[in-house]
Amino acid sequence: MSADKKEPSFRESVDLMFNRAVALMDLSPGLEEKIRVCNATYTVRFGVRLRGQIQTFTGYRSVHSEHMDPVKGGIRYAMAVNQDEVEALAALMTFKCAVVEVPCGGSKGGLRIDPREWEEDELELITRRFAYELAKRDLIHPSQNVPAPDMGTGEREMAWMADQYRRMNTTDINSRACVTGKPVNAGGIQGRTAATG
């Protein structure tokens, strides 16, 4: 890369890949832009009392496409999480699901946090509060938006999120299906035990 030309951001790289694919297709007017953009991105900021003070956290959940319900995509915990990243990852989830004919739209979420900086009980409080903020907006829901583990999260975090959803939706008989990647003893299924990263 030359000194006068900056490297594209992750989001810009996804758009460049999309542009190359679209150039090979005959899409009706307006459809290209509809496919390119995310339907919605939600930013949540919440506080949790930890270590004698209120700690404020920022999280995101982006829904790229709801052409098929539910939407599906991981939740990551990392200090570099931002809106552009979750929107790009949500778009990639839509494309991946479409290519392999999984009947789901794409979504992705993240919490700007270094999970290694927190004790397990603190991380549980943070995760449950994040899940609460998402669930009250139907951004965790078995028939609408189903998160999964991603970088910095795993079975433990998915179990906490599923339990928080269940506590908020006591009459939902499908509450265990609100996330995937849970441990078997929390309603998960045999299979992958590690997430991306």
Where are the regions that the model predicts?
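N-terminal ligand-binding/catalytic initiation module
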Residues: 1-196
